Amino acid sequence: MLARALLLCAAVVCGAANPCCSHPCQNRGVCMSVGFDQYKCDCTRTGFYGENCTTPEFLTRIKLLLKPTPDTVHYILTHFKGVWNIVNKISFLRNMIMRYVLTSRSHLIESPPTYNVHYSYKSWEAFSNLSYYTRALPPVPDDCPTPMGVKGRKELPDSKEVVKKVLLRRKFIPDPQGTNLMFAFFAQHFTHQFFKTDIERGPAFTKGKNHGVDLSHVYGESLERQHNRRLFKDGKMKYQMINGEMYPPTVKDTQVEMIYPPHIPEHLKFAVGQEVFGLVPGLMMYATIWLREHNRVCDVLKQEHPEWGDEQLFQTSRLILIGETIKIVIEDYVQHLSGYHFKLKFDPELLFNQQFQYQNRIAAEFNTLYHWHPLLPDVFQIDGQEYNYQQFIYNNSVLLEHGVTQFVESFTRQIAGRVAGRRNLPAAVEKVSKASLDQSREMKYQSFNEYRKRFLLKPYESFEELTGEKEMAAELEALYGDIDAMELYPALLVEKPAPDAIFGETMVEAGAPFSLKGLMGNPICSPEYWKPSTFGGEVGFKIINTASIQSLICSNVKGCPFTSFSVQDAHLTKTVTINASSSHSGLDDINPTVLLKERSTEL
């Protein structure tokens, strides 16, 4: 009763019209207003009871006593390499642990989805309208006294000031995990099949109606775009040959809309599935590789099934590429990010006897969380030369000049930046970062600590606990005043990282559930789909089950250059700068009106 009285008192003192502004319901309890000044917490199936869902049930109490902290789990999984080498060789142990990883993470994501920016309560509209991003937490009610409910100041600090003071890079900080640019561009390329904000309607809306791994960034979101890029022969996509190698066709040859500045020559306006991928040659590199892979798989299937027509070859190849993508993401991409000695495994059969829903809805917070711009370097090093942002942006001639092989070799060697911790946001994306912060405010995100609680983490009690140091903590204290008013986006980038890790705790604990649910919730992972016949027989099934980032490169890049998602040598080779400005290139250097036309905050 005392806690309830204090929360209501705080709301009244602050002039709150909505008693749920104080976020009184804990442990995923649902707050429902009762009249104008009372609330009721629905604790159903939370494992807790009481007025604010704070008293654990008996079984919950036992689970809490036995459950190790995220820090402990991370330590165990990143140490004792000899033990994990043994575990990885014992199939039933590896399967048991992987099943637990998948279920424990994915069960943190509501399925079916619950809220969106306009519905802080469950509704048919929030469930059925696929044009919205869903929400992990409902938006802060409109009639609250502060932007975060009842905590913090009545106005948030100026977003430009936040970016400049606590996010903007002073000096490049390399990632201690050795993450490279092959990873950075893979992340950017992969996520743009489901992060497709509809800027014309607002940041809470998406054009990616499939809400998952559909490879629309390879094939196109609409049927018209897909058809314009297809050959309609042997299942293949249109292409052109340059210097004996396959590249995407041009905009002129496909009549596909792409975003390019007007001064770009027609022969350099490549047409791919995602209209924004002309922005960076690193994205066009991956677009080229996946184009080659699709057409290669079509050849394999054509040989296996000469009786099949164009449509079946195309559709089956697409399913195979979706499977390859999911396997690469889990076993190479997520494996690298985790730093675990335990080997992650893509095996849909692990979930066949579990309660699991094969559907997914992309959350706005997942989009915000994935703003990993600190990965970007100050310059791009390719074949002994350096390109600054002004030289790199919208410049497909760089890809043609050096070739895909040299791009792969160079990006594999170049280290990316550390995402969490100290200021490491490149100046070139300052405006993009500011837009991300502005849009999260427009969508009325709850505080960083509320998101920590949502993902079963202990809220931070001070800015110093958040950052792990005093100087940054003092800056944040001056900007926000209250740790419970700290915003999600900047907090993710200033949170103290785990030792020798790229991310802080919250990025991992919140990001992993979104990622794994989205990957394993794909229809191809369901019992009805996951069988050889779906993929053209054992030949197609084998392509998926043997996929890796290295095999993708070897099958489609001349010379089969070595690649991985981490640098093998932390000492970077010296390079020559060509026509490079001594200052960092900002967005003003690259025609921001074009860049900001669509989805700038996601690039």
Curated annotation (Swiss-Prot):
Pathway involvement of the protein, from the record: Lipid metabolism; prostaglandin biosynthesis
Subunit note: Homodimer.
Signal peptide start and end residues: 1-16
Glycosylated residues in this chain: 52, 129, 395, 579
Disulphide bond pairs: 20-31, 21-144, 25-41, 43-53, 554-560
Family: Belongs to the prostaglandin G/H synthase family.
Topology relative to the membrane: Peripheral membrane protein
Site keyed Aspirin-acetylated serine: positions: 515
A molecular function GO annotation: metal ion binding
Catalytic activity line of the entry: (5Z,8Z,11Z,14Z)-eicosatetraenoate + AH2 + 2 O2 = prostaglandin H2 + A + H2O; (5Z,8Z,11Z,14Z)-eicosatetraenoate + 2 O2 = prostaglandin G2; prostaglandin G2 + AH2 = prostaglandin H2 + A + H2O; (5Z,8Z,11Z,14Z,17Z)-eicosapentaenoate + 2 O2 = prostaglandin G3
Residues recorded as bearing S-nitrosocysteine in the entry: 525
Cofactor: heme b
Localization per record: Microsome membrane; Endoplasmic reticulum membrane; Nucleus inner membrane; Nucleus outer membrane
Residues bound to heme b: 373
Domain EGF-like: 17-54
GO cellular component, one term: neuron projection
Organism: Ovis aries
Record-annotated membrane-spanning stretches: none
Posttranslational mods: S-nitrosylation by NOS2 (iNOS) activates enzyme activity. S-nitrosylation may take place on different Cys residues in addition to Cys-525.
SUPFAM superfamilies, per database record: EGF/Laminin (SSF57196), Heme-dependent peroxidases (SSF48113)
Gene3D superfamilies attached to this UniProt entry: Haem peroxidase domain superfamily, animal type, Laminin
Note: The conversion of arachidonate to prostaglandin H2 is a 2 step reaction: a cyclooxygenase (COX) reaction which converts arachidonate to prostaglandin G2 (PGG2) and a peroxidase reaction in which PGG2 is reduced to prostaglandin H2 (PGH2). The cyclooxygenase reaction occurs in a hydrophobic channel in the core of the enzyme. The peroxidase reaction occurs at a heme-containing active site located near the protein surface. The nonsteroidal anti-inflammatory drugs (NSAIDs) binding site corresponds to the cyclooxygenase active site.
O-acetylserine PTM sites in chain numbering: 564
Record key words, sorted: Acetylation, Dioxygenase, Disulfide bond, Endoplasmic reticulum, Fatty acid biosynthesis, Fatty acid metabolism, Glycoprotein, Heme, Iron, Lipid biosynthesis, Lipid metabolism, Membrane, Metal-binding, Microsome, Nucleus, Oxidoreductase, Peroxidase, Prostaglandin biosynthesis, Prostaglandin metabolism, S-nitrosylation, Signal
CC cofactor note: Binds 1 heme b (iron(II)-protoporphyrin IX) group per subunit.
Active site: 192, 370
Protein name, per record: Prostaglandin G/H synthase 2
